[in-house]
Amino acid sequence: MTHAATAPPEPAPTPAGLDAGFERAARAAGGPVDLRLAVAGSAVRVRFAGTTAADALGRAFAHLVTARDDAPALTLHVWDSVERPAFAAGRPSEAETPTTGAGPSYFYDELEFRALHQPASDVLSVLSADGAAGWFWMPDATRLPYWEYSAPFRHLLSWCLDAQGCRQVHGGAVGTKDGGALIVGPGGSGKSTTALASLLDERLRYAGDDYVAVGGEREPFVHSLYCAAKVHHDDVHRLPHLEAALADGDRADEKAVLYVATAFPGRSIAGFPLRAIVLPRVTDRRTARIVPASHAAALAALAPSTIFQLHPPAREALARMADLVRTLPSFVLELGADVETIPAELVRLLERLD
């Protein structure tokens, strides 16, 4: 998924107008539905306008739900409606709408808030200047592209995490409570295959396949954001342990979406210390093998897609990711035809680094 930030096509939204739009939608849907989460050590309250939006977008956070009633660091207001907020220009025609990524975006950053409209998926994300309030609008919660279900509110969370000293990155992560690996690479490199293959081994826990957050002052620590995963339909046969659990998309060009916390109870994890950076690479080998990689290769696999997809301040984000790859050893995971050999290689690596 790539993005090109441009000037806003319409007048900017206002927090008051967004609040009013949410309240109207909530009343029409029978009232708000609240979801309380613990995200990267912070309390987050998500207010959905009705059960339809909550059911559609809340499943990706099932492993982060908490019964604690702490004051939220961030409150998100999530609704769908025919009425369009300011700044959300009309969606392009079907011929112009990308089917395999989020396409270009319109970004707006002012003293009072920042906003991002993605015409391809037709969603609007707005965050207040203090990072305490966010708004996420969509025209229909039941008709979003697959990537919005697998990684809801990713830009809002990225902006908020930045203020807390965490960096959301384009990568997956698997490991144990004692330590794990960040899995990085461009689309098609095997990140999801590697992360989902870990479910074959009871020793490993799943923290994400596409977006996670990295923080930690004394040692790098990965925070899970989503328990959802995406699988190309053409790859399902290589991961037969997932077939019964896949929530299939309704278009032939979609990836299938899997909710790990539901399909594999106890296998999702909120986070762990980072021990290594792993770069999957598709090869013609039969079995998987791990070999050393350079810090430069790790940065090249991590930074470009993170910056293009999540819109962080590029210079600062690049510096922080460069610091991260200098801190950790990096390895290439040569993927073979036998996917079931992947988790054993990861376990051996983590045991060696422990």
Q: Which residue stretches match the model-derived regions?
A:
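Conserved glycine(s) of the Walker
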Residues: 189-191
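A noncatalytic interaction/capping subdomain that flanks phosphate/NTP-handling catalytic cores
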Residues: 2-187, 197-207, 212-354
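Hydrophobic positions on the alpha1 helix immediately C-terminal to the Walker A/P-loop
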Residues: 194
